[in-house]
Swiss-Prot record:
Entry GO terms, CC: plasma membrane
Ranges annotated as spanning the membrane: 6-26, 27-47, 56-76, 143-163, 195-215, 224-244, 258-278, 300-320
Keywords: Cell membrane, Membrane, Transmembrane, Transmembrane helix, Transport
Full protein name: Putative transport protein jhp_0514
Compartmental location: Cell membrane
InterPro entries: AI-2E-like
Length: 349
């Protein structure tokens, strides 16, 4: 057996066992690596003023405040809402909702019976039990999320500290020319920077838009604005987690016009205008004006890759989806610019 074949057999065996050993941490390591790549320009900026250790720590500290503090805020506010529920008021609200729905559906016999049977099991006791189950699930999920976040932050410090060494090492190890490897890396890093900044600005815009509106109806605009901005990152439901309960609350108190306005404002202005219209425009602006990058990836493709990533990977899909897309497109360009052209030159000769 040739030494080269023997080496690759040993390498594949070792690689398999490495994956098996660290399989529970692969996603955390991937997220930490992608965040490091996307934010490494911040690290380079801080390196001009601080030592490598301090600049790495500052980068991790900023990310920790962005990830852990909002999570604590959500858990704290959510637990307060659940444990401060007034059972009598909740029963009255449910009774009113059931009566209103049944009365309005009396003109539609085809669906009236089915909805009435469903509402028979709809009571304050069942909702309270469901909320307790949800709070228990949120508690377990939050604990796992905090554990993952702490592990990611630990890996981030490691990646930030040794980032330049890792970069040079991987460029040298890859079986490609140096400029080819750099182009792939620059493509992925550029997309990550655009996605991270776009997501941050979108969260702020949606939170400010909702908080500014809701304060006029006597609610806590600061807290609900933060919650809405964070809820907008939740796949599928997004800000509906916030505006639906508030609209129901306004309906219960007889504020029909206010409830309709909250629903339309949340769906049309925030859901359609900001999330579906302004967000793609933001991607174009950030790409061409802020980073002034020469990336040849369509902005709409970046937008849809974020949506696809969220649907497949959940919260972290915001960065995983665009990364996969950018990496694949970079490989296609590499194949087009180097391998196809090389074959054409060979044929001409």
């Amino acid at each position: 057996m040739k030494a080269q074949y023997f080496f690759w057999i040993l390498f594949l065996i070792g690689f398999y066992w490495m994956l098996y050993l660290y399989q529970d941490f692969l996603m955390d390591a991937l997220i930490a690596g992608l965040l490091c790549v996307g934010l490494f320009q911040v690290k380079v900026f801080l390196n001009k003023r601080f030592s490598n250790v301090i600049s790495s720590f500052l980068c991790v500290l900023v990310l920790a405040s962005v990830v852990i503090v909002p999570l604590y805020f959500i858990v704290y506010k959510g637990s307060n809402v659940i444990f401060e529920i007034n059972f009598e008021k909740l029963s009255a609200l449910i009774k009113w909702l059931k009566g209103t729905i049944t009365e309005n559906l009396s003109h539609f016999p085809a669906i009236h019976d089915g909805v009435s049977k469903f509402l028979e099991n709809f009571s304050a006791a069942s909702i309270t039990g469901y909320l307790l189950k949800v709070s228990s699930y949120i508690g377990k999920y939050s604990l796992k999320l905090v554990t993952d976040a702490l592990f990611i932050l630990g890996l981030l410090f490691f990646f930030f500290y040794y980032g330049e060494k890792f970069y040079r090492y991987f460029l040298g190890v890859l079986p490609l020319e140096m400029n080819q490897s750099k182009k792939i890396f620059e493509e992925v890093a550029g997309i990550l920077r655009i996605v991270l900044l776009t997501s941050l600005i979108t969260v702020i815009l949606e939170g400010v838009a909702f908080g500014t509106m809701i304060i006029w109806f006597g609610h806590d605009g600061w807290s609900l604005g933060i919650l809405y901005g964070l809820a907008s990152l939740v796949p599928a439901v997004g800000g509906a987690l916030i505006w639906i309960p508030i609209a129901i609350y306004e309906l219960y108190h007889g504020h029909v016009n206010e409830a309709i306005f909250i629903v339309l404002y949340s769906i049309l202005l925030i859901g359609v205008l900001i999330d579906s219209v302004i967000k793609p425009i933001l991607i174009v602006f950030i790409k061409k004006r802020i980073f002034k990058t020469t990336l040849k990836i369509n902005e709409i493709l970046i937008f849809f890759s974020m949506i696809a990533g969220i649907s497949q990977f959940g919260f972290w899909g915001i960065i995983v989806g665009p990364t996969i897309t950018a990496f694949f497109i970079a490989l296609l360009r590499l194949y087009e610019n180097y391998f196809i052209q090389k074959e054409q030159k060979t044929c001409e000769c």
